[in-house]
Amino acid sequence: MNIFADFDARIKKTLQDIDLKPKDGGELDLSRIGVEPPRDASHGDIATNAAMVLSKAVGQNPRELAARIAEALKADEDVESVDVAGPGFINLRLKASYWQRELLVMLNEGTDFGRSRLGAGKKVNVEYVSANPTGPMHVGHCRGAVVGDVLANLLKFAGYDVVKEYYINDAGAQIDVLARSVMLRYREALGESIGEIPAGLYPGDYLVRVGQELAGEFGTKLLEMPEAEALAIVKDRTIDAMMAMIRADLDALNVHHDVFYSERKLHVDHARAIRNAINDLTLKGHVYKGKLPPPKGQLPEDWEDREQTLFRSTEVGDDIDRPLMKSDGSFTYFAGDVAYFKDKYDRGFNEMIYVLGADHGGYVKRLEAVARAVSDGKAKLTVLLCQLVKLFRNGEPVRMSKRAGEFITLRDVVDEVGRDPVRFMMLYRKNDAPLDFDFAKVTEQSKDNPVFYVQYASARCHSVFRQAADQLGLVDLDRVAMGSHFEKLTDESEIALVRKLAEYPRLIESAAIHQEPHRLAFYLYDLASSFHSQWNRGAENPDLRFIKVNDPDLSLARLGLVQVVSDVLTSGLTIIGADAPTEMR
């Protein structure tokens, strides 16, 4: 249960009980009332701004109104004390019995604790990675892959119907270049000396194997075909090979998409999907024939000093109108974006989330304009931009040459440090802030390495369970037994740990609402820190050890507390896509 939602309802009920009314009549607007943890834990367990947001409507001084509300809240059987602070904040401290009951709820819910129905009935498409199928994934793709994947997992846990999607850019000019590059490697595999790879083609050695496979399958037959026919075959085989490589790279990172959507699908049957999308916009009055003035600075590739078919995107929030069709009748790349969004909308998605690199910042307004025009403002579109990742080794920048083939791949990073450190650390900054990734730092065993610190907390929980088996003979811990004596958990440090656990449902919902999966990584680190602190208190004070052989009931209660810590760590790490280890190796 979300205790903050619980007390939000209690506080609003209290406002009704004291017959709080607007001075001008009517009903009070309670929508701005906030109920959250105090910024300073010493101030209490629950804080609300109710008096400050209602004082003007009620016509009463905020502190005086706060005192009136506070007095009424003291009647709540779960409230230990109520204080008014600052300009009119109300801080509530709850009784230990309340936290003990809440801990039992958490224990009974297990790893489902924190699961929400926030997104019930809402269908969301999360598109992420969508790297061009022209080679292996490099480290630059890594952050967007993790942010998108964890956000999708988070939304699912919060009750949304989520589809993870990858858009395969397999219809552009770069694919023609790729096919010609592989054709060269095919000829090389047949024994021809190809010399240096010509400028403009892809030089990477990863294409050698594709050429060899073509030579093994076709022999010299491709050389005997008309070039266009041979290149069409090479293109299909190469895209399949590149996507197999990309899928393998993503699998190594524990990233799995539900849908791989081919751009070429939009171009089949004389680009029917694109034509239909443009026709729909035309019927809505969003398309016209005209000429665009030359933009300042570098000219975009879709600008022409001729009449074109244009999207009236400035009327739906964009900076300039956008070309859909060139003067020669060919479609712009942007026209494909319109058709792709329409396809998503027609599949029934209420919300579309695009996770893109920071270099795609210029796409945001045009995509938002497409969403408004295609859906008549009914669909929500969000673009999350991921800033660059800078690689370091022992504090020194890792140099990457731009020369042929000399770049660090996603697989290089995962193979060196492991999947879990990569996923966790890619979340340890908000997506729109640059991130430093130090190969040495993410593998060290210290508090300064967040992923180690969190996973070590999980392993320590299971260490306590093994001690219970050795010292108390409790091989199979029973949740009913562990929850039968929570009234024995009275030490302030134990209650503080329960408070931290109780924040989890609110954290899940707020991270989902704001689409900020990094909040989960921060919370898990804080929870791990609280648990490690409690472990250390037991090392210093025998009375606070999790297992007291001479007090089995207290031991069971503390084991129940440890079990809930383990459950929440497991739940959070699962959403992140990392393991919750039972021991550190």
Swiss-Prot record:
Family: Belongs to the class-I aminoacyl-tRNA synthetase family.
GO molecular function: arginine-tRNA ligase activity; ATP binding
Record's subunit section: Monomer.
Protein name: Arginine--tRNA ligase
Organism of provenance: Brucella melitensis biotype 2 (strain ATCC 23457)
Pfam family, one: Arg_tRNA_synt_N
Lineage, uppermost ranks: Bacteria, Pseudomonadati, Pseudomonadota, Alphaproteobacteria, Hyphomicrobiales
Residue ranges of the motif 'HIGH' region: 131-141
Subcellular location(s) of the protein: Cytoplasm
UniProt xrefs under PANTHER family: ARGININE--TRNA LIGASE, CYTOPLASMIC, ARGINYL-TRNA SYNTHETASE
Keyword rRNA-binding: no
Keyword line: Aminoacyl-tRNA synthetase, ATP-binding, Cytoplasm, Ligase, Nucleotide-binding, Protein biosynthesis
Catalytic activity, reaction form: tRNA(Arg) + L-arginine + ATP = L-arginyl-tRNA(Arg) + AMP + diphosphate
NCBIfam families: argS
UniProt xrefs under SUPFAM superfamilies: Anticodon-binding domain of a subclass of class I aminoacyl-tRNA synthetases, Arginyl-tRNA synthetase (ArgRS), N-terminal 'additional' domain, Nucleotidylyl transferase
Any single GO BP term: arginyl-tRNA aminoacylation
A Gene Ontology cellular-component term: cytoplasm
Keyword Transcription regulation set for record: no
Alphabetical list of PROSITE patterns matching this protein: AA_TRNA_LIGASE_I
Enzyme Commission number(s): 6.1.1.19
